Amino acid sequence: GFQYQREAQAYYEALKKRMSKFGLELESSKSKIIKFGRYAEQNRKALGQVKPETFDFLGLTFYCSKTRQGKPCIKVKTSKKKFRQKVKAMKVWLYENRDIRVKDLMDKLSIKLVGHYRYYGISHNGKMLANFRQRTIEYLFKVLNRRSNRRSYNWGGFTEMLRYYKLPYPKIYVSLFD
């Protein structure tokens, strides 16, 4: 990041120029200069705007927030777009694999969940990871009940099955503050 807008503007122009040397160009809808960081909230309030802008990068949304002590900090969470895509992909995967044995399904599902947690398991993203796990469990319940003409599980039996085939809980793998 840059402390002053003129520095950011100079870098932005230099980047455009450098990329044009190689026949590349910046997508203007995906690149912009935003006020971000320690004073972003104060500056936006002075202009009569509500919250500081956010930006998405590699499936994560970066936003300005405050610590428990009230100090400004930058936080990260799964972007809404990627969250919806991943939930939909998980739903499709569950429906495609509903005919395999429950033990095998749960083993593969555990591996998929851990992979998701490892990529998105960053400081301050625990809530989105928990939401993903919960949505996965809801779809798993629906999928397992569509395996035959009669209902396979009620919610009590399903939670009993989940106690036997434990699904991993979300874990923060990368701390931004170490």
Task: Spell out what each predicted region is.
Residues G1-D178:
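Non-catalytic terminal/accessory segments
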